[in-house]
């Protein structure tokens, strides 16, 4: 499920999961003032891969193989998807925080496990778990049944509009559209409204009004108009959030693997942070996220305390 809270995390209460109902995953949305900085402009000229890039790809493959090996060894893939996400996400604790890993020219779907930001952390965790559940029966007899390509395919399905990568503007840049699109695809279910959520007046427009901060828009100015049209569509939809004052009241309903999004009041943006819930042995809903402040993937305090 995915849930939206106001005043802190920029996600709303919504269920994330696979189309098969038995594999559905949950997540929450929260809202709070944004303090993040913008993406610096960089040279987007296409270049051959450097040795550093090759090394990063090889290291990502090594990390991926280790995660899958541990998952199969401990049979995490047999758990409900939320619990599976919790186990997989916890394996990334300590991974350094690195932003901007998706900003490639030309656009391509990429997995980089050398460093994670708040979005790529939950994206990778979700899609490794989704793939594991899809491949669960095959993995029982063949430990090599789940490949890097399988996860990349699932990631493309959730990261891009209608599940198809077709250039920079097909990526779901705004979390609010990610939610809408993945609800439509049956990947997640938004529970924000039924859990007491309030209308959230999303008015995105930051990308089209600040193209200088996005290397791809600098390189291809004609894409800005497409982005503006996407923003107008997002703004015309209905969105919901859970006010901070109500978070503690619903905290007991959170489960391990629930994805959290934190809304922002920064002009032109919708959400500023994402993460997921880990329910500990005492039943406390802790916030697991890639923290820019801690500079790593970190298991934080109670979600209500985090938002306080």
Stretch-by-stretch model annotation:
Residues 10-47:
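Bacterial Sec-dependent signal peptides at the C-terminal "C-region" and cleavage site
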Residues 28, 72, 76, 80-97:
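Sequence/structural signature of beta-propeller domains
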Residues 57, 61, 78-86, 108-119, ...:
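Solvent-exposed, acidic/flexible segments
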Residues 92-235, 279, 283, 289-292:
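Acidic/His-rich structured neighborhood in mature extracellular/periplasmic domains
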Residues 223-253:
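Mixed-charge, Lys/Arg-rich low-complexity intrinsically disordered regions
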């Amino acid at each position: 499920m995915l849930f939206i809270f106001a005043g802190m995390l920029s996600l709303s209460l919504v269920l994330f999961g696979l189309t098969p109902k038995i594999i559905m995953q949950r997540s929450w949305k929260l809202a709070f003032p944004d303090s993040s900085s913008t993406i610096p402009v960089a040279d987007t000229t296409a270049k051959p891969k450097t040795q550093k890039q090759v090394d990063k790809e090889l290291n990502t493959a090594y990390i991926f193989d280790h995660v899958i090996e541990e998952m199969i060894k401990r049979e995490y893939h047999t758990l409900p998807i939320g619990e599976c996400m919790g186990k997989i996400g916890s394996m990334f604790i300590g991974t350094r925080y690195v932003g901007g890993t998706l900003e490639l020219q030309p656009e391509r779907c990429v997995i980089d496990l050398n460093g994670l930001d708040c979005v790529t952390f939950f994206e990778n965790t979700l899609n490794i778990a989704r793939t594991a559940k899809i491949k669960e029966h095959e993995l029982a007899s063949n430990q090599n049944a789940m490949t890097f390509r399988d996860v990349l395919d699932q990631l493309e399905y959730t990261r891009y509009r209608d599940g198809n990568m077709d250039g920079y503007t097909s990526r779901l840049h705004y979390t609010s559209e990610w939610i809408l699109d993945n609800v439509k695809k049956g990947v997640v279910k938004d529970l924000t409204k039924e859990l007491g959520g309030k209308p959230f007046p999303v008015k995105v427009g930051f990308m089209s009004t600040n193209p200088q901060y996005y290397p791809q828009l600098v390189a291809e100015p004609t894409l800005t108009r497409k982005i503006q049209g996407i923003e107008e569509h997002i703004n015309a939809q209905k969105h919901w959030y859970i006010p901070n004052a109500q978070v503690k009241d619903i905290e007991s309903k959170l489960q391990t693997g629930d994805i959290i999004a934190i809304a922002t009041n920064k002009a032109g943006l919708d959400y500023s942070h994402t993460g997921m819930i880990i329910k500990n042995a005492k039943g406390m809903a802790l916030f697991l996220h890639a923290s820019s402040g801690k500079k790593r993937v970190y298991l934080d305090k109670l979600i209500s305390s985090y938002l306080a």
